[in-house]
Amino acid sequence: MKNAIVIGAGIVGLATARALAAKGFAVTVIERNELAVGASIRNFGMVWPIGQPTGKLLERAMRSRSIWQELCLAANIWHEEAGSLLAVHHRSEMQVIEEFVAQNKNDRHCEILLPKEAIEKSPALRNENLLGALWSNTELIVDPREAIAQLPLFLKEKWGIKFLFNQGVSHVETSKVLVGKKVFEADLIYVCSGQEFETLFPELYAEQPITKCKLQMLRTAAQPNGWRMGAALSAGLTLTHYGAFKDCASLSALKKRYEAEMPEYVKWGIHVMASQQGTGEVTLGDSHEYGLVFDPFDKDYINHLILDYLDGYTHFPTRHIAQTWNGTYAKMKNGATELVLHPSNDITIINGLGGAGMTLSFGLAEEVVSSV
């Protein structure tokens, strides 16, 4: 049996380990922390096919969704087939979603709902100024903190994948991985190190059109009395953030309106989404700052912008904020949706999925290992 080493136990590493094990490899995952604590646990937990462009990326997202569902059912990980609503409050936003639905009538299960219909799918939506909403039934929600912690246990049980936590890889070369003075050998090595560019192959990363993105997020206290928000929510600003909408001719006018009327939201890359976890908390965000180094301090101003926009289209039984945090992920600067490099025949780097790691990783990993 051939063996493989995967470096990193975030979502990209876990997806790669699963894909390799499914092909018959003996797999060892090496993670520098006692559990993954990076971008993979600092997100909404949204598997979000509606945001991916029609074609290869949508197919990849739907394959990932299928794998997520399979794993969650088998491993008893909480998940919800919540679907999603993108609420619109201005004619310019409505034009974009009308165009989107017309373009995708043969490729997606989506439709425009009247305000009353949208509120039936999510009681969190405000009726004031609501023109309608783009409904999609494909979105799936997990709690990333729970899922990323539980998946290693299941992958070990089902496929015998070995996990070595608290083991920092310092060097990789052909067929060898160094952890301190220990040497691990493998037929294939996959480096899935997320926003950590500085330790493994830093010179190679320096040649790539890749950067980092810092985002700020929040989470409410658990909603009282078992209240559920239903569909995952977003609103007009989200139309400017996801590639699925880029071919809508009316998007250009919408962007210009936001630049004129909401310049601070454009400056900080803010669009506002909400998803509810199984324990009742609602995860909110986010902003987008780009660069290779960030100050470690969150900006209260950004959090207030997020909450102000949220309050304009939602209401929750409690909006008490229990937690705030930031996350950082790798992002391509050239429009690419991932970075796959081969420093040598037996070493592969998988990175640069931007903010779509939860949505695309399982599908991408299968594609990457399909030829081995």
Where are these regions (language model features)?
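Dinucleotide-binding Rossmann-like beta1-alpha1 core, especially the glycine-rich loop
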Residues: F44-K121, L130
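Glycine-rich FAD pyrophosphate-binding loop
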Residues: A22-I41
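Helical element adjacent to the flavin cofactor pocket in flavoenzyme catalytic cores
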Residues: A133-S175, F184-L188, C192
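Short beta-strand to alpha-helix junction loop
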Residues: E59-R60, A87-V96, L134-L153, P296-I302, ...
